[in-house]
Amino acid sequence: APVDEKNPQAVALGYVSDAAKADKAKYKQFVAGSHCGNCALFQGKATDAVGGCPLFAGKQVANKGWCSAWAKKA
């Protein structure tokens, strides 16, 4: 199941299913071009539309999504 943006955990992390809608004023660490699909936490392939994330157990995040825990994939 996809992560609901209104889920308390999602709200706390500023999760959005479309990185273009990330609150860049609130999250100064936002990096242009960052999204779930190129995050170290993303548990899918770079080509998958959705994938697992350890921050949202049992849920799937959008590849093009974003949250404040984003960390560049090595």
UniProtKB/Swiss-Prot annotation:
Transmembrane segments: none annotated. [4Fe-4S] cluster binds at residues 36, 39, 53, 67. This is High-potential iron-sulfur protein. Gene3D superfamilies: High potential iron-sulphur protein (4.10.490.10). One of its GO terms (molecular function) is metal ion binding. Homodimer. Belongs to the high-potential iron-sulfur protein (HiPIP) family. Keywords: 4Fe-4S, Electron transport, Iron, Iron-sulfur, Metal-binding, Transport. Specific class of high-redox-potential 4Fe-4S ferredoxins. Functions in anaerobic electron transport in most purple and in some other photosynthetic bacteria and in at least one genus (Paracoccus) of halophilic, denitrifying bacteria. It comes from Rubrivivax gelatinosus (Rhodocyclus gelatinosus). It holds the Pfam family HIPIP. GO terms for biological process: aerobic electron transport chain. InterPro entries: High_potential_FeS_prot (IPR000170), HIPIP_sf (IPR036369). The gene is hip. Signal peptide: none annotated.
